[in-house]
């Protein structure tokens, strides 16, 4: 029996191990694909890294090459940085996906074993640990702030009441707008969403309203926000200027 060992590492911080085998022996070229914070599709391969906000959904592919006629098995192992001996998740698929919701650096490893008759080719950790190039995905600590005023006048900069743009790694979110009598006017479950200053499609009067937010970050931090919201009609945010 011929056995050839290889090892592939990929990290988000996820591990999947990479290498090449001479000739037409099957290989894997692991890749992680996701949409970054700028809404751009991003690919990571061994030796590359990414830092961003949760929740982050990543598609993993073992991407086998020259594998026709071979029977393959795959194992994706997910670790946290500093704990590479004990994966917190194992997936037995050629392609898989995972949503990262915990702050910190995650490591993901992809193992593959190819069999054809008496031949066996393994891409495992044992023989290529020194050449493993982790793809690292680091999830930031959480942050969430809500503004105290907005002006629903059609100006896209201020017409929707929503979380400030600096929010990060919010994995649970629920917000409610109420009036001074405690009547619920609007609620939403995504920090990217918000209130347009209407109730049942009709604009509400200028004045003071209240927002109640319950949220949780990827780092376990709990946010309980209660504050006034000043709705200003007829106000337009001044255009930004650049000093000469």
What are these language model-derived features?
Residues 20-55, 237-244:
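Sec-dependent signal peptide cleavage junction
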Residues 125-136:
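Terminal edge beta-strands and adjacent linker/stalk segments
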Residues 49-50, 54-61, 103, 134-244:
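Short loop/turn motifs at secondary-structure boundaries
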Residues 1-28:
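Bacterial Sec-dependent N-terminal signal peptides
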Residues 113-125, 216-220:
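Short, solvent-exposed loop/turn segments at the edges of extracellular beta-sandwich modules
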Residues 71-98:
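Surface-exposed, flexible coil segments in extracellular/virion-facing regions
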Residues 65-70, 167-169:
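Short glycine/proline-centered coil/turn motifs in the loop regions
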Residues 70-74, 171-174:
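Short beta-strand/loop motifs in extracellular/secreted proteins, especially
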């Amino acid at each position: 029996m011929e056995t050839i060992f290889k090892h592939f590492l990929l990290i988000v911080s996820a591990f999947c191990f990479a290498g090449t085998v001479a000739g037409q022996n099957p290989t894997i070229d692991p890749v992680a694909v996701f949409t970054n914070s700028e809404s751009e599709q991003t690919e990571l391969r061994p030796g590359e890294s990414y830092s961003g906000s949760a929740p982050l959904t990543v598609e993993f592919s073992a991407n086998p090459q020259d594998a026709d006629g071979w029977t393959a098995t795959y194992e994706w192992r997910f670790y946290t940085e500093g704990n590479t001996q004990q994966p917190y998740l194992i997936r037995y698929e050629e392609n898989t996906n995972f949503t990262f919701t915990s702050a910190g650096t995650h490591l993901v490893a992809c193992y593959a074993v190819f069999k054809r008759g008496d031949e066996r080719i393994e891409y495992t950790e044992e023989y290529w640990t020194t050449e493993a190039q982790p793809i690292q995905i680091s999830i930031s600590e959480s942050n969430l702030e809500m503004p105290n005023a907005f002006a629903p006048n059609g100006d896209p900069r201020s017409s929707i009441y929503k979380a400030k743009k600096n929010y990060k790694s919010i994995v649970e979110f629920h917000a409610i707008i109420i009036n001074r009598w405690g009547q619920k006017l609007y609620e939403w479950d995504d920090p990217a969403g918000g209130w347009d200053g209407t109730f049942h499609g009709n604009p509400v009067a200028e004045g003071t309203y209240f927002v109640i937010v319950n949220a949780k970050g990827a780092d376990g931090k709990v946010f309980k926000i209660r504050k006034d919201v000043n709705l200003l009609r007829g106000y337009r945010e001044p255009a930004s200027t650049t000093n000469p």
